[in-house]
Amino acid sequence: MAETNNECSIKVLCRFRPLNQAEILRGDKFIPIFQGDDSVVIGGKPYVFDRVFPPNTTQEQVYHACAMQIVKDVLAGYNGTIFAYGQTSSGKTHTMEGKLHDPQLMGIIPRIARDIFNHIYSMDENLEFHIKVSYFEIYLDKIRDLLDVTKTNLSVHEDKNRVPFVKGCTERFVSGPEEILDVIDEGKSNRHVAVTNMNEHSSRSHSIFLINIKQENMETEQKLSGKLYLVDLAGSEKVSKTGAEGAVLDEAKNINKSLSALGNVISALAEGTKSYVPYRDSKMTRILQDSLGGNCRTTMFICCSPSSYNDAETKSTLMFGQRAKTIKNTASVNLELTAEQWKKKYEKEKEKTKAQKETIAKLEAELSRWRNGENVPETERLAGEEAALGAELCEETPVNDNSSIVVRIAPEERQKYEEEIRRLYKQLDDKDDEINQQSQLIEKLKQQMLDQEELLVSTRGDNEKVQQELSHLQSENDAAKDEVKEVLQALEELAVNYDQKSQEVEEKSQQNQLLVDELSQKVATMLSLESELQRLQEVSGHQRKRIAEVLNGLMKDLSEFSVIVGNGEIKLPVEISGAIEEEFTVARLYISKIKSEVKSVVKRCRQLENLQVERHRKMEVTGRELSSCQLLISQHEAKIRSLTEYMQSVELKKRHLEESYDSLSDELAKLQAQETVHEVALKDKEPDTQDADEVKKALELQMESHREAHHRQLARLRDEINEKQKTIDELKDLNQKLQLELEKLQADYEKLKSEEHEKSTKLQELTFLYERHEQSKQDLKGLEETVARELQTLHNLRKLFVQDVTTRVKKSAEMEPEDSGGIHSQKQKISFLENNLEQLTKVHKQLVRDNADLRCELPKLEKRLRATAERVKALEGALKEAKEGAMKDKRRYQQEVDRIKEAVRYKSSGKRGHSAQIAKPVRPGHYPASSPTNPYGTRSPECISYTNSLFQNYQNLYLQATPSSTSDMYFANSCTGSGATSSGGPLASYQKANMDNGNATDIKDNRSDLPCGYEAEDQAKLFPLHQETAAS
């Protein structure tokens, strides 16, 4: 019951946001000019509101200026509404929600959630509060529950006081601000949001957060109730600016349509002359009917953009706010009378009714006297007020005369009509139930149809993509086949070249073998020469000793002869000189022979070098051509290694020859020194030995030049051998790389073949689905013909029914012609019933058509049902396995349960004195959730992890369902609060906990399937098995 009516206007507040980054980069101007706290000038025109907030206003200032008083009004029993209206990206969601868990940037809704409980905690302790919250959105003109996403099309009904409400919406009982924030987080995650050119997080629906507060005074039993609607409207959009396309464009159309309906309601209420206000044009205006011109205290936020780019939209928004400011609401306290108050009111109304009956009796007596022709004196007449009252009563009860006329109908006929009326009303009730069931079925089937259409569209898109990919893969496959053909041809050519090169290699190997034999012969010759050279050296040494001895003897003889003769010239005999020349001649012959042997060896080495270079060149060509053939390369590598070893051995032999050559050179130098000494001794023989000296010098120069050339040639050969070895290593690496690439190409080819096979199978499946779709179309045609025949039959039955009713009316008129008034009213009732029957017939036709349309979807649904059944079987198997795993982990969980037991005992000292009942009542005078006595009332990570671990272990114990475990006894005993034993194990404790927390008893709490929906702020709410609850 509502009392204490107060007329008040809608409070309109205007808020401008700052320029965003895009507007600053675009160079937009800041157009509003603020004049005081209640006016703003746009384009030279002033707009006046209750309050105007500039861009630098904080969230806290906005809340204190507008929303704080509404919290007090709602707690005092009034209804309240706060909603934000404006263009898209104007800051509506920031104003209403903000950042939920940021103390500085949180919006109106989280601040109201905290402020409500702060006021409650400071109120009288005799009051008890029950707080429920709901959260839903209006998306594409359908009401969608944000706390239960399965409810996608809720309806709007009226209660006994003709106040609109959303039927079937989820209602959650809360006992603290953190629980409200959790509900907001859950609903916000399910809300529709999209990206547009003007807003990265554009709301695509109107969201309504409803807080229903009921309070009861435990002493006086007085009850008050208040509702607070917190509405975040979607922004009006100009498609040319937002760039909406596809589904976003459809959302924009519905948003603008509903906002246009809101504007029409505001305009009609602002004019005040229209008798009809189009509340039913939109579900949003229907829900907010009481907030616009009804029993509510309403605050409207007008959110505007300060950019010159949005000049037109800003002016339109400000004009909308000015019209809304003229609307008058009649707010009253929602008070429920107590039994004593109802009794007093009943006595008062009883006395008033008795007085009215007396007045009616006097008026009837006076009226009968006037009809009988008597003249009633003025003293006996009733006073003017009483006569007016009697006239008013006569006007209010015209139906009683008709009822008296109806009574004159025969009892049998009246009973017959009453039975007919009861039957018809029963049929109406049955039809209503059937219509409700059919409408629910239609909604489900329509939703399934939409799902199937979406699936079909996605399947078609996937089919097109698959076709494109298939064509692309076919082209790639053709190209790959061509490449494979080319590779095969190249391999064939390489095989032919391989055979040719193999033959060439065999020939070269034979040639190399011949060269090796020749080289071995030359080496043997060189060894014999070395031995001969050593023998000659020995002979030469022996001769030199002999010559030295002879010369020494001669010198002694000459010295003695010179002493005897004096300074006479002494000449050696010719035989001695001839012997020396003969010795030198023999030495020169040996030296020339050695030179000729060395030249032949050098010449042969050059030939070998040329042959080696030619062979390496041919092997490099062979390596490039036969890179993909690993066997051939390995053979070449073996041969190259053998040749390299051979060259190394040749090089060693060359070094030995070089060393022997050096030793011969040293011996020659010694001989030259001795010859020099001999020349000094034999000065008189100088003209004869001059030719020999020149020959020795020429021979020495020639030997030196040959030695240097030989050293250079050997160094060059070593460098070339090293380079060839590097080339061989590089060829090995290249061969390995090419072999890996060939293996990769083969793997890719196999992968392409498998993908082609998969695409062909998918194409066959899509072809099969298309054939099934065509068959469904043919079945649909047959069903339409069947429905047409059924409609014709229904039409014939209706005609027969009308004829029957007409004949009955005619018979009743012939039997009692004097009861024309009763028959007339009966005809009206019959026509009313006929109209109802006709409407039911239309509804039935529509239902038949809908059913015919939906029957063709039955095969698909049956297929999905079979798939679902198979999935359920698989899940049951998985569940069975999980249970077996849980039984295995029982010992490990036991230790965790013991630890939690100690933690719960430690935390039990911080619980509140009064635990939550089914409806979670909130008592003033207790400490709030963040008080020192309840340190775990905050949303800290430690508390959340603690609660999660507690619930997880309890759930595992519930799944095990073993009464013998000590953990079951712990939960049964510790949750009762008295230490008494409890039967039933963890299953009974689990069910009891759900009942006491409002999850199984309250018919409006739709979270009965979520046993974990508790806050960490009150650990006792998880398992509150109190003695008083058990007693009740």
UniProtKB/Swiss-Prot annotation:
The entry's keywords: Acetylation, ATP-binding, Coiled coil, Cytoplasm, Cytoskeleton, Hydrolase, Isomerase, Microtubule, Motor protein, Nucleotide-binding, Phosphoprotein
Domain Kinesin motor per the UniProt entry, residue ranges: 9-327
Record keyword GTP-binding present: no
GO biological process: anterograde axonal protein transport; vesicle-mediated transport
N-acetylalanine PTM sites in chain numbering: A2
Region span, Disordered: 904-939
Its EC number(s): 5.6.1.3
PROSITE patterns: KINESIN_MOTOR_1, KINESIN_MOTOR_2
Residue numbers bearing the Phosphothreonine modification: T397
Entry coiled-coil feature ranges: 331-906
Gene3D superfamilies from the UniProt entry: 6.10.250.1590, Kinesin motor domain
GO CC field: axon cytoplasm; microtubule; perikaryon; perinuclear region of cytoplasm
Pfam families: Kinesin
Family per record: Belongs to the TRAFAC class myosin-kinesin ATPase superfamily. Kinesin family. Kinesin subfamily.
Protein name as it appears in the record: Kinesin heavy chain isoform 5A
Source lineage: Eukaryota, Metazoa, Chordata, Craniata, Vertebrata
